[in-house]
Amino acid sequence: MNSYDPQDTASEQQEETVALKGHFYGVYLLCSQSLDPRFRGKCYVGFTVNPKRRIRQHNLGCDFGGARKTSRRGPWLMVMIVHGFPNNTVALQFEWAWQQPSLSTRLKMYPELKRKLPRETFFDYNFRILSHMLGVGPWNRLPLSVRWLETDYERPFNMPLPNHMDIVSGKVSISASQRKRTDDAEVPPPVAWASECHLCMQQIEQPERSRLGCTNQMCRLTCHMMCLANYLLGDEPGHYIPVGGQCPLCENRLSWAALLQRKRLLLGVPKELRDYDEDLIEDIDVDSNIEDTP
């Protein structure tokens, strides 16, 4: 049984394109559907930039790019995936903490996460860890989406999630084109940028790297990324990642996630960089020890 059966054309038609190739970083949870009672129900946490390809690799085995710990212990279902991470580094850190809750400094205030409870399933244990992770920093500041890929596993979270996080259902697809299929993901029109930051009034030296503008197309806001982040964090001392706020120029409501998405769409990602990034990242395979917890 395969969460992404290549011959299941009906499920292909129901997939939602959520990101451009080169802009997707997800941390997923697999559950074994093996008939062998030694493996059935075991779980695996992993990272991917291409969920459809990754589940195929896991089910095909080590020789085809799958992980050692999932080889010959399936078939596997990819039951859920957390995505919306700003880059692969943040996603890999999230993956590691989910795999190793007893070692993560972010989760040290939850000693109950160190071990699976006696009658708790491996899935319930992983889900309990995730519920706590999404409520602590820095992850509770990120514009993450929790996507259920298999409705049979779907359930309410043990703890309330931050209001800016989405809980959605359905298969996920990554577009190789330069545009997503949804209207809000169209490449923005060219922007007439100012040469100076509206907040610090200093010259923007590396505009492609450090410049941000408002999501309102009629607004001429031009800022250093750090200046705008600090401005939006004005009412939230002690944090480093803004969730959103009001534009200092047009007073339009801003979402930090939307600002970064707009920046990426304006810059684009060269084909050679997209291919290199995906090939490099998919070679990173940190085995999860969660399924071996007594």
Swiss-Prot record:
It is an enzyme of class 3 (hydrolase). Its EC number is 3.1.-.-. The keyword Lipoprotein does not apply. GO terms for cellular component: Slx1-Slx4 complex. Its main location: nucleus. Belongs to the SLX1 family. This is Structure-specific endonuclease subunit SLX1 homolog. The lineage of its organism: Eukaryota, Metazoa, Ecdysozoa, Arthropoda, Hexapoda.
